[in-house]
Amino acid sequence: MQNIGYCGNHCTYCFFTACKGCRNEDVCYSYAALFDSKKCPNAVCCAAKGLIGCWECDNLEKCQIGFYCSGENDAKAYALFIKKYGHKTYTQTIEKLIAKGYDYPKQFKEISDIQEILNIFESEI
């Protein structure tokens, strides 16, 4: 799970190449760096609930914490995909999409519709 953020973003394919991910102590490039506490709200919430990631939460679809309140619909779509299909299928699907020419994650950040993102991912299963 080290390469998947609590919110569902996949660190291996992130365009912030210097970032070591939110599961690392060095948060200088991660979303956590935006907060005075240097802690991502999604990571804090997961830790408080004892969750590996937001995809384990029963409130995911309605959640407005962290990435999910900032219009990051791609992150929520990723978490919903992981919830339904698991993190291994998620990683494999990203690899298939990249091989087809998709620019992950940048291209998906431009899509505001969660279901549209899910449809693209599910078309590769």
Model-identified regions with their sequence ranges:
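Cysteine-centered metal-binding/redox modules
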Residues: 1-125
